[in-house]
Amino acid sequence: MPDNSTTLFLAIRASYIVFEIVIGVCAVVGNVLVIWVIKLNPSLKTTTFYFIFSLALADIAVGFLVMPLAIVISLGITIGFYSCLVMSCLLLVFTHASIMSLLAIAVDRYLRVKLTVRYRRVTTQRRIWLALGLCWVVSLLVGFTPMFGWNMKPTLESARNYSDFQCKFDSVIPMEYMVFFSFFTWILIPLLLMCALYVYIFYIIRNKLVQSFSSFKETGAFYRREFKTAKSLFLVLALFAGCWLPLSIINCVTYFKCKVPDVVLLVGILLSHANSMMNPIVYACKIQKFKETYLLIFKARVTCQPSDSLDPSSEQNSE
């Protein structure tokens, strides 16, 4: 008969797997809906929403690939070292794809309020695709860096326990990589840069609104729309930071040889994955175009009408 500690361990693992499955399904369904909305609504085919499309793709990958892989890794199954390493690297790739997409969105909104008239000449279709490609190339390079030698294989071989290897994330990915390269270099620095950009965006908009109060109503309307959009996208950034920083802090604590309870680690992992299902909710609540298109899709599904000609009229809260 299993003792209480074993029963508790199994209950925690089972709960973790159930939550991962629920979060994964919600992330996939929600972000597929985001892509559907962008495809159907012509007014959303703008630079910012190309990057939101990229973010949604990364979140779909988290739900469809990362969460099943995270469940497999949490079980500590016995597989080859490099098979485990590839799975672990995929977890990292899509995390960094999300933050690179968020950075691209922040830069785009900055250019939108800074350049105004010259914005459309600067953000050409070619440059947009180059920026999207760069986001994913950087994510692949950062995420797959452990495949090029920065991994735990030398440590395992020197400890002579390589033959009975169990696949766990920290058994293949060094904490030095997670803390100094992945977190400090490619998560924390971009987060700080994005915060600085949004602070400057709000500063510019505030000044322009003050100036336009006694001049052109059209200018004031433009900057009020930009303010609403910037607030919504900053909320997306804040949620990303709030969901991912706890796990990064746990990694830092682990690096300095402090013991972290398994349940705390699992909650941190779940919180980071839950971020992938939050963005569609933010868009629905905060961006009018999304809300109206969501409702039209729902109405079309309920009444069995085709929805491929959607063109909802809504207030301009983006370009």
Swiss-Prot record:
InterPro entries: Adeno_A3_rcpt, Adenosn_rcpt, GPCR_Rhodpsn, GPCR_Rhodpsn_7TM. It is a multi-pass membrane protein. Glycans are attached at residue 4. One of its GO terms (cellular component) is dendrite. Its main location: membrane. Keywords: Cell membrane, Disulfide bond, G-protein coupled receptor, Glycoprotein, Lipoprotein, Membrane, Palmitate, Phosphoprotein, Receptor, Transducer, Transmembrane, Transmembrane helix. It is found in: Cell membrane. One of its GO terms (biological process) is regulation of signaling. It comes from Oryctolagus cuniculus. Disulfide bonds join 84-167. A lipid is attached at residue 304 (S-palmitoyl cysteine). Belongs to the G-protein coupled receptor 1 family. Residues 39-49, 108-127, 200-232, 286-319 are cytoplasmic. Phosphorylation on Ser-318 may be crucial for rapid desensitization. One of its GO terms (molecular function) is G protein-coupled adenosine receptor activity. The chain crosses the membrane at residues 16-38, 50-73, 86-107, 128-149, 179-199, 233-256, 263-285. The keyword Phosphoprotein applies. Receptor for adenosine. The activity of this receptor is mediated by G proteins which inhibits adenylyl cyclase. This is Adenosine receptor A3. Residues 1-15, 74-85, 150-178, 257-262 are extracellular.
